[in-house]
Amino acid sequence: MNRSNVHLLDLPNEILLTILKKLNNMDVLYSLLDVNDGQLDILAQEKTFTNVLDFGHTDNISLIDRFCIYILPRICHNIEYFILEPVFMERILLAAVYPNLAELKLFNFEQQIVSTYFTDELLLRSVFQQQITSLILVNDDKGAIIGSLNEYTRNIYVHILNFFKNLTHLNIIGPNIMLCPGLSLCDLPATTFSSKILTHLCIIVENFDDCLYLLDG
C-alpha cells in the first residue's frame, strides 16, 4: 500500500478551523496571524478567534508588543470584549480603533484607576463613555486602606456609574468577598447610586439596608 504524505495545510479549511478552535485563541493569533502563509493568516482572523481577547494575568511584554504593533490593528473591527490588566489597558486600547468593542473586564482594579483612567481628560474617554455597555471590575482594594465606605462609594462606585454613560451591565466583584469594599448608601441621598438604563448589577453591599436602598432606587 502506498503511503501519501498529507501536510496540515493540505486539509480543508473546515477541518483546519476545527483543529484551531481546540487551541487558545490568543495562541492562535500570536502564532499564526501575520505569518508567511495566507491560508492560516485568513483563518486566524475568523471571529471565533478575535471577538474576545484575554490579556488578564499576563506580564509578557513581547506578547503585548506583538499584539499592539501587528495584531490588534488588523483585527480591531472584530473585537467586542477585552479582558485586561490595568498596567497594559491604555496601551492596548490606544493600539487601534475598536468600533464594536462593548464589553470590558478589568483585573486588579484599585481606586487610583478611577482618577487615572476614568476621567474626561483621557483620550480613552469616548471608548469608556460611549461604547462600553458591560463592565466587570475585579476589585483588589483592601478594606484597611480605603477609609470611609461612604466616601469610597461616592468617589469610586458612583463615579463609575456616572462616567460610563451607556452602561447596562455592571459587575464589581473581588478575589475574596471579605476584601472587596462594600457599597454603602445608608447615609447618602437616595438618588446617589441610580441609573435609568442599568439592567444588571452585581455588587457587594455593606449591609442589608444598602440592598433595600438599591431596590428603592
Segments from the language model and where they lie:
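Eukaryote-biased activation of long, low-complexity terminal tails and linkers
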Residues: 1-217
